[in-house]
Amino acid sequence: MLNLNLANLQFMAHKKGGGSTSNGRDSQAKRLGAKAADGQTVSGGSILYRQRGTKIYPGANVGRGGDDTLYAKVEGVVRFERKGRDKKQVSVYPIAK
């Protein structure tokens, strides 16, 4: 006598049993990148750049948060600048009144 339990056979099935997949998920976008443009006037505490790691370094009057977000410490004009040959920084220069 045949043991049919060994080989999960499906006789006379029009559609065979579908397997499962380990795909079908995706994480939400984190909305990283520049939040203020070069030359834009910002107030103190405004977020300038959201990033993972130090893609852009903080310059004058710019702070770095715990998640590497760059923010303005004072009200002023945003400037994206080079820092040496291979690095970039963002600074905020106060507006002269």
Curated annotation (Swiss-Prot):
Stored InterPro entries: Ribosomal_bL27 (IPR001684), Ribosomal_bL27_CS (IPR018261)
Molecular function per GO: structural constituent of ribosome
SUPFAM superfamilies documented for this protein: Ribosomal L27 protein-like
PROSITE patterns for the chain: RIBOSOMAL_L27
GO biological process: translation
Keywords, in A-Z order: Ribonucleoprotein, Ribosomal protein
Positions of the propeptide removed during maturation: 1-12
Record region (Disordered): 15-37
GO cellular component terms given for this protein: cytosolic large ribosomal subunit
Post-translational modification: The N-terminus is cleaved by ribosomal processing cysteine protease Prp.
Pfam family, any one: Ribosomal_L27
SS bond list: none
HAMAP family membership: Ribosomal_bL27
Family that this chain belongs to: Belongs to the bacterial ribosomal protein bL27 family.
PANTHER family the record matches: LARGE RIBOSOMAL SUBUNIT PROTEIN BL27M, RIBOSOMAL PROTEIN L27
NCBIfam families assigned to the protein according to its UniProt record, in alphabetical order: L27
Name of protein: Large ribosomal subunit protein bL27
The species this protein was found in: Streptococcus suis (strain 05ZYH33)
Lineage of producing organism: Bacteria, Bacillati, Bacillota, Bacilli, Lactobacillales
